[in-house]
């Protein structure tokens, strides 16, 4: 009797370990980084859009490895348009992911370098950081680079001199973090 019980218990433990392994594989497979073709509806009235994630009240709240969605809200009564950004879990479909933050080298108190210079500098820094984050050369990647540079008003009051760089796939959403994805 003891032997039959031991064999039965052994079989049960073996079966449970197989189930646990297959559920781990399934969970890992669900979060494989990728690009989801097509864009979810991100424009609509305040009442019709379903927002996901934490609402960002100030774009400078976004930081490295934050994944985010962008929405365009239209007020049905006035026709006013406003843009809204939310931080979401990177395992959920998202529009973009912040991969780097770079402080402009100008000394405190120096005037704003201008939009053209700021965009040029941001493009260089974002390009330089792309391969280290994604794991592939930009020219071979399906991802594009975007940046959120400081605005003149924020620069002049000394609040922000940091540019945030992000990756996105035009016309699509991302799934999982793009860190080391090679996409």
Please state what every model-predicted region is:
Residues 1-9:
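Bacterial N-terminal signal peptides that target proteins for export
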């Amino acid at each position: 009797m003891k032997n039959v019980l031991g064999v039965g218990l052994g079989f049960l433990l073996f079966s449970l370990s197989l189930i646990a392994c297959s559920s781990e594989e399934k969970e890992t497979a669900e979060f494989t980084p990728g690009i989801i073709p097509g864009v979810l509806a991100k424009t609509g009235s305040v009442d019709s859009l379903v927002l996901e994630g934490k609402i960002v009240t100030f774009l400078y709240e976004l930081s490295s490895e934050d994944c985010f969605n962008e929405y365009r809200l239209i007020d049905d009564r006035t026709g006013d348009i406003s843009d809204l950004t939310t931080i979401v879990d990177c395992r959920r479909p998202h529009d973009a992911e912040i991969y780097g933050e770079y402080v402009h080298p100008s000394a405190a108190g120096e005037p704003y370098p201008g939009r053209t210079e700021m965009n040029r500098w941001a493009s260089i820094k974002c390009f330089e950081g792309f391969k280290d984050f994604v794991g592939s050369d930009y020219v071979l990647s399906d991802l594009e680079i975007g940046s959120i540079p400081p605005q003149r008003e924020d620069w002049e009051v000394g609040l922000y001199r940091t540019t945030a760089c992000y990756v996105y796939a035009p016309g699509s959403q991302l799934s999982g973090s793009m860190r080391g994805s090679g996409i």
